[in-house]
Amino acid sequence: SLTATGVIQILADYAQGLIEKGKSAAEVAERTDIFKTRVHAIAMVDTLEFLQKGGRISKTAAMIGELARLKPLITLTEEGGVGVIGKAIGKNKAMSFMLKWLEEHPVDDAWPKYSIYTCGTENCEQFEEKLKNHGIETMGRLQIGAAIGTHIGPNAFGIIYVEKA
């Protein structure tokens, strides 16, 4: 998945910097392992249909959630899985939740930030505008790969970034 690739790119850049400073392989591995806890990928799921089709939620939960315009907010966990960090009613409240998350887990501007999306960039573009209004500029846009995209469906969007230490 390109999302994972974005996270891996940040980790590789960090490790490369340590190597250039003459750190040992063991120290590079140890420090990178600690650093990876600061790298986050958060996203909003636009539809519950694909979570239901993938067996992640029941048909009833999907139907009720869709009627309520429920938008799950997810992140990659330290174990490499996907975890729910919150839920919002509607896309705008989901974006507000994500911006609040970024305030509580502040962005380290020394590292690149990437906006992420499944298919369809409209939501991602709106989120990038809100990020910009909050002083957060992304370096580029990465499409979420099929491994995750098939489970979260179209029009999902988010950000990959490094949290301040």
Where are these regions (language model features)?
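Mixed-charge interfacial surface used for oligomerization/domain docking
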Residues: 2-165
